[in-house]
Amino acid sequence: MTKDLHETESPARRNFIKAGMVAGVGALLTPLIVKTAQAATEAAPAAAAAAAAAGEKPKLKIGDVLRVAREKLYPICRVCPECDGVACAGEVPGMGGIGSGQAFKNNYNALNKIDLVMRTFHDVKKPDLAITLFGQKLSMPVTSAVTGGVSYNMGKKMTEEEYVISILGGCQDAGTIGWVADGIGDQMDVFERRIAVLKNTFGGRAIVTIKPKTNEEIIKRFRMVEEAGGIAVAIDIDSAGRAARAVPGQTVEPKTPKQLAELAKSTNLPFIIKGIMTVEEAKIAVDIGAKGIAVSNHGGRVLDYTPATATVLPAIADAVKGKTVILVDGAVRRGQDVLKYLAMGADACLCGRPLVRGAHGGGRDGVALMMNIIKDELTVAMTLTGVPNARNVPANVIAKVQA
């Protein structure tokens, strides 16, 4: 029997045909893609050599940085076109979100759904991105986030020293500052190596975060940071539930307000509490003397199904704005993301996973490139929303609250 051309085919037959078509196209295109990639790879050294012969430093390109990062980090990080937590869900240790990965995805999705209001009837031609953070003048309201664990989170493709130099140096070259991490599974000697780089290479110009160990162990590390000339100290209290991964004798734990007050009083450096997700705890942080808070769910890596930082930030900012420095992290991928967070009440943002890519794909220069791209995007976004400076971003920049 002849089938009518308009008769509906079975789903199974359609899927079989589609699969065949995809396979056929893939077979045709794969050699071309490989050949093109090989040609680009072979041409890169020649271009670099020509630039060197001319006395020029080869200009780093974002495509090259991402390609190298993908080669080094795969399969721990796939360097996806959109770093949204989907492909790496459940990959902890690694670069993903814990469990279902929903907390990581919440961060990305909530921020991605926020729209900006374009305004062009104004005289804002060169917006001022500069801020002062804990006495440091920064070129933009963005620092690195707290990222570490090059051995168990990043595949050990860099040494601790190389990674710290890349993050802090790249941030410095972009006119801002970075953070030094304290890994949950790190022995004391690993922390000491990071602090040595901070002191000897950067004169202490960074913020150092400590895991919520016993107060005695935290204060011991505070003294090391003070001696190194650090800008500020922090604890990432959002790591309090990860005792099973801690080094024996270096357990982590939640903290009472009394314990937090002891930490705040124990140092002459500004004390920051990272991992604030409620108005209640933001107020407590202010009361015990914290000079800064970081609204953070640890990149979605500690408690599955936590809300996005973009969801909780506005209420926290309403409660404590002006009483302490408000920092925020969570899916900062572009300059537009920074503007959104500033409009919701943050004083500055922390950028994490993109800088991990930058460090592995281009070292110090790769991190600087990532940060400068964000800076350029923020400049354009502020111009097109009529925001003259990053220190006072109005809420009506966000579409849902526009005047």
Model-derived features with residue positions:
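N-terminal secretory signal peptides
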Residues: 1-12, 38
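Hydrophobic faces of well-ordered beta-strands that scaffold small-molecule active sites
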Residues: 142-145, 178-180, 206-210, 233, ...
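Alpha/beta enzyme core
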Residues: 215-307, 312-326, 344
